[in-house]
Amino acid sequence: GYTDFDGYLEEAIPIHGVMGDSHGALYGQGCVNPGMIKATYGTGSSIMMNVGEKPIFSDKGVVTSLAWSLSGKVNYVLEGNINYTGAVITWLQKDLGLIASAKETEELAKSANPGDTTYLVPAFTGLGAPYWDSKAKAVVSGITRTTGKAELVRAALDCIVYQISDVVN
């Protein structure tokens, strides 16, 4: 097909390919060989691994999809999508007012009591991969009298790592 982007271009140009954002990121980050993996962070996250020309089906909560088709060769991926990663930082800033900007999180987390056991499950809109539980609710646990802003921020950063680890493992 062709497009002129609804009149933006003087002439229509040919469409040579269409690709979703996560799949485009996989290709753009050079993950073109089986076993190569990428993580894309945004409001949520997409963890994707190139599995090559034959689909692999997992029973671990990740999905199989088509990566791309080039020159008659099809590549497949295993993918896990996480609902809340970057949005956790937005929650700290805009909803809780604990930080003025995302830049503050690293220093705050470093200053947290290393023995604090505060843990966040950011299921504000359910849980994505690998659990796929749309009814799950967010939980903050392990709070003690000494838990403060730094510990809550560290728990928020940790929950991003835990979710990525859950998908990869």
Feature annotation, model-predicted:
Residues G1:
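Glycine-rich, acidic and aromatic/proline-enriched surface loops and short helix-turn segments
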Residues D4-N169:
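Active-site core segments that coordinate phosphate-bearing ligands/cofactors
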